């Protein structure tokens, strides 16, 4: 079996650049996922993020989760649960406007650290989008502009903890899905595993590695590349031992951004056979996704194509 792609971003400097870019290209085309090491975010800083996130869970969220489990009788289930996930979560919004100062129960240090964390990940996301542009033969800045909308991209973080589960065979940590948005950057627990992706009909573990950032591609990048890159189904398997930390940051298009395949990536044959992905306003896709997240993505694309309107397309200026 092929090894899960692990990419050292330091390889972009010097003679290793071509090989590193080829690894990124292969990961985007064949996996939809890859793991970054030497990505430029200091390891000491990531240690602080992890420590404060786990402290916050223990102090503010753990008891609430136990009460939720008890109220729904989840510890005693005998049949598979298909309408809930075994996870404790909260959300932080960064762009276009941050809500970190308004989120309750966050210690000041944790609040400030997560603001800094968001800035570092935003910078990394935009660097990666330009690397994808380079591999796709698009102008530098094309993908960032494609995401822009009126007020810039949307960017937020889902902070999750997956506590020990007595019946992991009956309830998932997170049910299988593809991500609706653009580029996802995940800082995950390196001691407790659980994340899996679907490749060639097999569920494959995403290896937990200390201080790495896991990248996966969302549905919008599949549309913009007209299927050259694809979003991939993934899930979280609950574990009987240990609480798994997951901090997933989503660099997505602005709500009013018009998403459509980059013209240079639409081959003539695909156009003639009407094998071109739809164009739509990102917010409209998200409304559809909200009710269909845990279902296959293809019907979502078909539904958007069916209601496709004459949205005015203007060339994406990258200069």
Swiss-Prot record:
Residues 153-253 form the Fe2OG dioxygenase domain. One of its GO terms (molecular function) is 1-aminocyclopropane-1-carboxylate oxidase activity. Keywords: Ethylene biosynthesis, Fruit ripening, Iron, Metal-binding, Oxidoreductase, Vitamin C. InterPro entries: DIOX_N (IPR026992), IPNS-like_FE2OG_OXY (IPR044861), IPNS-like_sf (IPR027443), Oxoglu/Fe-dep_dioxygenase_dom (IPR005123), Plant_2OG-oxidoreductases (IPR050295). Pathway: Alkene biosynthesis; ethylene biosynthesis via S-adenosyl-L-methionine; ethylene from S-adenosyl-L-methionine: step 2/2. The keyword NAD does not apply. It catalyses: 1-aminocyclopropane-1-carboxylate + L-ascorbate + O2 = ethene + L-dehydroascorbate + hydrogen cyanide + CO2 + 2 H2O. The keyword Coiled coil does not apply. Its cofactor is Fe cation. GO terms for biological process: ethylene biosynthetic process; fruit ripening. Its EC number is 1.14.17.4. It holds the Pfam family DIOX_N. Fe cation binds at residues 177, 179, 234. Belongs to the iron/ascorbate-dependent oxidoreductase family. This is 1-aminocyclopropane-1-carboxylate oxidase. It comes from Prunus mume (Japanese apricot). The lineage of its organism: Eukaryota, Viridiplantae, Streptophyta, Embryophyta, Tracheophyta. The gene is ACO1.
């Amino acid at each position: 079996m092929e090894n899960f792609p692990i990419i050292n971003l330091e390889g972009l400097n010097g003679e290793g650049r071509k090989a590193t870019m080829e690894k990124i290209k292969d990961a985007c085309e064949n996996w939809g996922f890859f793991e970054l090491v030497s990505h430029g975010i200091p390891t000491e800083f990531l240690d602080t993020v992890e420590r404060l996130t786990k402290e916050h869970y223990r102090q503010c969220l753990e008891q609430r989760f136990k009460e939720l489990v008890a109220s729904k009788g989840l510890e005693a289930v005998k049949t598979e649960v298909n309408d809930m996930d075994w996870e404790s979560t909260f959300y932080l919004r960064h762009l276009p406007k941050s809500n970190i100062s308004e989120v309750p129960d966050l210690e000041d240090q944790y609040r400030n650290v997560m603001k800094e964390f968001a800035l570092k990940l935003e910078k990394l996301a935009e660097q990666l989008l330009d690397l994808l542009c380079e591999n796709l033969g698009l102008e530098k800045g094309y993908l960032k502009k494609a995401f822009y909308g009126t007020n810039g991209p949307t960017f937020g973080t889902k902070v999750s903890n997956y506590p020990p589960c007595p019946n992991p065979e009956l309830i998932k940590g997170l049910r299988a899905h593809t991500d609706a948005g653009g580029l996802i950057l995940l800082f995950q627990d390196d001691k407790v595993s659980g994340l899996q992706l679907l490749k060639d009909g097999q569920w494959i573990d995403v290896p937990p590695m200390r201080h790495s950032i896991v990248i996966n591609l969302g549905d919008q990048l599949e549309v913009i590349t007209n299927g050259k890159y694809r979003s991939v189904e993934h899930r979280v398997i609950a574990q009987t031992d240990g609480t798994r930390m997951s901090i997933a940051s989503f660099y997505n298009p602005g709500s009013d951004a018009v998403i459509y395949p980059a013209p240079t990536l639409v081959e003539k044959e695909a156009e003639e056979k009407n094998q071109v992905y739809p164009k739509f306003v990102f917010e409209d896709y998200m409304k559809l996704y909200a009710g269909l997240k845990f279902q296959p993505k293809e019907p979502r694309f078909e539904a958007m194509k069916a209601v496709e309107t004459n949205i005015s397309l203007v060339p994406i200026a990258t200069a």
